[in-house]
Amino acid sequence: MMDQLKTGAVDILYQVADGDQIEQGLDMVEDGSFNYLSYGRAGYGMISFKCNQGPTQFKEVRHAMAYLLDRVTFAQTFTGGHGTVVSGPYGTQQWMAEEYAEELDGLNSYTYSLDSAVKELEDGGWVYNEDGSDYSGSGIRYKKLDDGTYMPLVIEWFSSENNSVSDLLVTSLQQNPDVEAAGMKINQTVGTFTDLLTYYYDSSKENPYQMFNLASGFGNPYDVAYQYEPGSSNNTNALEGEEGQKLYDLAITMNHTEEGDDEAYAKAWFDFIADWNDELPEIPLYSNDYHDFFTSKLHDFEEDGYNWDATNAILYANME
């Protein structure tokens, strides 16, 4: 890709996210014939859960899994140092995140901790062996359900083939010895991306999978209410009940902010993010830093990827 820019086949490459490509581009910039822009992505990569069936229907399990993944190391490894960890469905480039940066820092970051994971599971009732006796301290934990049956703490994960994020999740989460030590097991099934989307959009309780990994971007204006509308096919997390309704209501409140009242909108946005951070229907994995690389003959090209993107910026740029 960078070779095309270097040879002049193209004049600009935008939203480059691969760490190796970014480093190659920065080396080219040092030679003096190219320039670049860098900005945070208005989106993120995540683990997405089904919240209406299996162990992940229980918030404590979702919390425990977050505690069992070193997200800081994961993000740095995957992005090659050109990315960061966020605490909800947002990107660092969004103006709301800049306005509420201090408050966002105060949200639960789910810092890696086996002890915290175990406490969440114990508080959530995962305190039994398969036969109903008190958990012995090794093996799979079980939770007693309202119907008297015992549910094993086994999560079924569907991932797409040839996916570097999935590969990293295998080593950093699925095969992490602390996952077993916590009394949890994650089974991985690998298939096509088409198959992944089929299961991802299936919010029936018969769906055999509860965990997926993929990425999402956010539009401008930021509107996610449709993704959390109870009973909607767009509600891929299938977050239901009072918790799901509350999250949806917060998203609607954000959308109904009076036009031009940026302060009220940003406050409503943060209220949504804070509740989302507690419900945790998804685990944010990384938010990339995008880079645009372009010939030094291109002038006045300025974008931030969200408030003012490349489709706008190119209209005001000029070539020597």
Which positions does each model-derived feature cover?
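Sec-exported extracytoplasmic/periplasmic mature domains
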Residues: 6, 10, 30, 54, ...
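Short, solvent-exposed loop/beta-turn-alpha elements that line the ligand-binding surface or hinge
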Residues: 25-42, 48-58, 95-116, 129-152, ...
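Append "and occasionally in soluble cytosolic enzymes with long acidic Gly/Pro-rich linkers
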Residues: 57-175
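Active-site-proximal beta-strand/loop segments in catalytic clefts of secreted hydrolases
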Residues: 15-17, 39-41, 50-52, 77-81, ...
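Amphipathic coiled-coil alpha-helices
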Residues: 120, 243-246, 250, 264, ...
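Extracellular/periplasmic solute-recognition and catalytic clefts
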Residues: 1-53, 64, 72, 76-77, ...
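Periplasmic binding protein-like
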Residues: 5, 176-233
